[in-house]
Curated annotation (Swiss-Prot):
It is a single-pass membrane protein. Residues 1-110 are annotated as: Required and sufficient for mitochondrial import. It comes from the Eukaryota. The chain crosses the membrane at residues 138-158. The lineage of its organism: Eukaryota, Metazoa, Chordata, Craniata, Vertebrata. This is LETM1 domain-containing protein 1. Interacts with BRI3BP. Interacts (via C-terminal) with SMARCA4; the interaction regulates transcriptional expression of thermogenic genes in brown adipose tissue. It comes from Bos taurus. One of its GO terms (biological process) is mitochondrion organization. The keyword Nucleus applies. GO terms for cellular component: mitochondrial inner membrane; mitochondrial outer membrane; mitochondrion; nucleus. Residues 186-360 form the Letm1 RBD domain. Residues 1-137 are cytoplasmic. The gene is LETMD1. Plays an essential role for mitochondrial structure and function, as well as thermogenesis of brown adipocytes. In brown adipose tissue also localizes in the nucleus where it interacts with the chromatin remodeler SMARCA4 to regulate thermogenic genes expression, such as UCP1. May regulate phagocytosis and inflammatory responses to lipopolysaccharide in macrophages. Involved in tumorigenesis and may function as a negative regulator of the p53/TP53.
Length: 360
């Protein structure tokens, strides 16, 4: 009764006569709806700002991949001749970017743990060595692209001269074989000159036994015989001091050796000697790391790349023969001291010139 009187009193003040029962029902409905509207939303139904950003990024990436796939199919269908170099170029950029990230991780790890280059595992050492050469070649293209509108000329030069201007990532499979054959033919041109210098220094060797060994080795090379490991190691003293030590090499000898190592010979004698020392030291360090790892742990491509770096044209030689040759090289290299690295430098010619299958 009291509640009904209050309701009638309020209705009278508001100027309308509303039955008390109806007012109570409406009031309860308003309270329930207010409770429903005012309740906090569940976190399960709505993502946080970070999750929203991640979902947006994943959506954009997915859409980009779809559009990119459609674009590739369009190019392959309507412009097949352009699609092949375009695909190789894009894959080359991806591989170069991946190499850069890996090299950065290796350098960061070296800096954190105070590791020197020669203390790295073989694969990391080889990756850094190759990446430095690739970056040097890419920097040359970058310098050419600096002038206004020069980038169009650079693209034309890259298309016309891929062997000279591009790194291996941007070569087709056929180009990789052809270009490696061309490079090996260029370094083979220096082999007769290097052997001729070895014959000329025979009278300058003071030890009669070493003179005989050098003469025998040169005779075997001229007859087309592949020398044994002990035949080469028997001459290590000749390459430690006069007349074939690294510091006793003449300018013409160093230029011929640079061509055999695929290094530019168009530098002053001081720079040629420094570059030969540096390059040979890096190969010697790689050999020590590879001996620890073991030739059997390398893949077929790694074996062929290692042989090619050391003077053997491995593109046309069976994998097992490449492994055998690389084992002979490591046997010689790991037996040498730092003062005898001139022998390792000449070994690029001595061990590869008459190997079975390398005469191409």
């Amino acid at each position: 009764m009291a509640l009904s009187r209050v309701c009638w009193a309020r209705a009278a003040l508001w100027g309308s006569a509303v039955p008390p029962g109806l007012y109570v029902v409406r009031r309860l409905q308003f309270v329930r709806s207010g409770l429903t509207w005012g309740a906090p939303r569940s976190s399960k139904l709505h993502l946080s700002p970070k999750a929203d950003v991640k979902s947006l990024i994943s959506y954009v990436v997915t859409k980009t991949k779809v559009i990119n796939g459609k674009y590739h199919r369009f190019l392959g269908r309507h412009f097949p001749r352009f699609y092949v170099p375009y695909t190789i170029f894009m894959k080359g950029l991806q591989m170069l970017w991946a190499d850069g990230k890996k090299a950065r991780r290796i350098k960061t790890n070296m800096w954190k743990h105070n590791i020197k280059f020669h203390q790295l595992p073989y694969r990391e050492m080889e990756h850094l060595r190759q990446f430095r050469r690739d970056v040097t070649k890419c920097l040359f293209l970058g310098i050419l692209s600096i002038p206004p509108f020069a980038n169009y000329l650079v693209f034309l030069l890259m298309y016309l001269f891929p062997r000279q201007l591009l790194i291996r990532h941007f070569w087709t499979p056929k180009q990789q074989i052809d270009f490696l054959d061309i490079y090996h033919a260029l370094r083979k041109q220096s082999h007769p000159e290097i052997l001729c210098y070895l014959e000329k220094v025979v009278p300058l060797i003071s030890d009669a036994g070493l003179q005989w060994h050098m003469t025998e080795l040169c005779t075997k090379m001229q007859r087309g015989t592949h020398p044994a490991v002990h035949d080469i190691l028997a001459l290590r003293e000749c390459f430690a001091n006069h007349p074939l030590g690294m510091d006793q090499l003449r300018a013409l000898q160093m230029k011929a050796l640079c061509r055999a190592m695929l290094l530019t010979p168009y530098l002053p004698s001081v720079l040629l000697r420094h570059r030969l020392k540096t390059h040979t030291t890096v190969i010697h360090q790689l050999d020590k790391a590879l001996a620890k790892l073991g030739v059997g742990q390398l893949t077929a491509q790694e074996v062929k790349s290692a042989c090619y770096l050391r003077g053997l044209n491995s593109t046309h030689i069976a994998e097992e023969r490449c492994r055998t040759w690389l084992g002979e090289w490591l046997q010689i290299s790991c037996s040498l001291k730092e003062t005898e690295l001139s022998l390792l430098l000449h070994n690029v010619v001595l061990l590869s010139i008459n190997y079975v299958g390398s005469r191409r």
